[in-house]
């Protein structure tokens, strides 16, 4: 909708390279910068990711996987915005006057990322799977990202 000024959050969560959750949703607040929109999206995706991590750990325990395997589970979040990565990874965060007012709201997710040893990885914008859920992409890009999601 061209008249809407809210950013759209889009992400996909995979377990063993299989998509288990994907979402596209308008953000409830209006972001004043791209970095702010990305931080809001990171926090929202983490709220969806953490219960899935807990579920995988519970299922692993239920089938008798060694605890060591469960505690060393590799979890990563791919982000294409460098500013959002710096703000998300740094504890205490490196605030700028513009970033301080919204970064305070996401302190919990920075702490969870550190506690759960989740890796935040910089990904090139052309590799960002979430773009399928946030914007119209050219056919070639759509087909490329679709193949990545499907594991082809």
PLM regions: where:
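Divalent metal-binding acidic/histidine catalytic loops
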Residues: 1-152
């Amino acid at each position: 909708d061209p008249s809407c000024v809210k950013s759209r959050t889009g992400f996909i969560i995979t377990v063993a390279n299989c998509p288990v959750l994907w979402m596209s949703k308008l953000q409830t607040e209006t972001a004043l910068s791209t970095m702010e929109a990305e931080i809001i999206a990171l926090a929202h995706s983490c709220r969806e990711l953490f219960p899935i991590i807990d579920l995988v750990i519970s299922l692993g325990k239920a089938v008798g996987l060694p605890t060591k395997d469960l505690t060393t589970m590799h979890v990563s979040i791919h982000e294409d915005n460098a500013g959002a990565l710096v703000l998300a990874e740094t504890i205490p965060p490196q605030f700028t006057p513009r970033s301080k007012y919204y970064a305070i709201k996401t302190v919990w997710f920075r702490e969870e990322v550190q506690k759960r040893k989740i890796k935040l990885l910089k990904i090139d914008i052309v590799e960002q799977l979430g773009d399928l859920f946030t914007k119209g992409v050219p056919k070639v890009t759509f087909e490329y990202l679709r193949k990545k999601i499907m594991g082809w």
